[in-house]
Design a protein with these regions (language model features):
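Metabolite-binding pocket within alpha/beta catalytic cores that recognizes anionic/polar moieties
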Residues: 1-106
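Short, small-residue-enriched loops and turns at beta-alpha junctions
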Residues: 33-35, 67, 136-143, 187
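Short gly/pro/ser/thr-enriched loop/turn and capping motifs at secondary-structure boundaries
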Residues: 66-68, 84-86, 167-170, 186-188
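Metal-dependent peptidase/peptidase-like ectodomains
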Residues: 97-134
Length: 189
């Protein structure tokens, strides 16, 4: 299903199915046939379309390069943090004169509950996973220079990829739409 959004068209149609009896939706961020480079993906439309179709969690699958010596090609990594080195990408739903200034809590960019579920499922399936990694999100589509990789390592990054941002921030913004942030004034105590 192709869903129109206020932010333009998503990268492609959303495919619906089931895994182990649970409903899932799949959206190819680079388009079918891998035709959209990372800096041209309409991340806002993609995340909005998934949200409008009722997604309650997003598992983002991406190809990354390993910076950390103990991470080998083929290893499964579930990052816990992200550093954004991208620029010029539409990275918020809260912009324009009709929107108020909104700040999302991005201290933990990835949903803790969903990470635990993924780690538990991987363990149950006997899949070894690195559960502590910092993802460096770069602009693409070119690969990074050796000097850039050295910088990312000094900054604390463990893996490098091109699609982690603004995807994670946009998903967090929409997750906050239906979630209470704190007790209301007059209700604390």
């Amino acid at each position: 299903e192709v869903l129109r959004t206020p932010y333009g068209e998503p990268s492609g149609a959303i495919t619906f199915g089931q895994i182990c009896g649970r409903p899932v939706a799949f959206l190819a961020r680079h388009g079918y046939g891998h035709t959209i480079p990372p800096h041209e993906v309409n991340y806002r439309a993609n995340i909005w379309a998934l949200w409008k179709r009722g997604a309650v969690g997003i598992i983002s699958v991406a190809s990354v390069g390993s910076i950390r010596a103990d991470l080998r090609p083929g290893d499964v990594v579930i990052p816990h943090q992200i550093i954004d080195y991208t620029w010029g990408r539409k990275s918020t739903y809260h912009e324009g004169q009709q929107c108020s200034v909104t700040h999302i809590d991005f201290t933990e960019p990835y949903d803790r509950k969903l990470r635990v579920q993924l780690l538990t499922a991987a363990s149950s399936a006997g899949i070894a996973v690195s559960n502590s990694a910092v993802y460096a999100a770069t602009q693409g589509p070119r690969l990074e220079t050796a000097a850039e990789i050295n910088r990312f390592e000094r900054d604390g990054a463990d893996v490098v990829g091109m699609t982690g941002m603004p995807e994670a921030a946009l998903a967090r913004e929409l997750a906050g739409v239906t979630r209470a942030h704190e007790r209301a004034d007059g209700r604390r105590g």
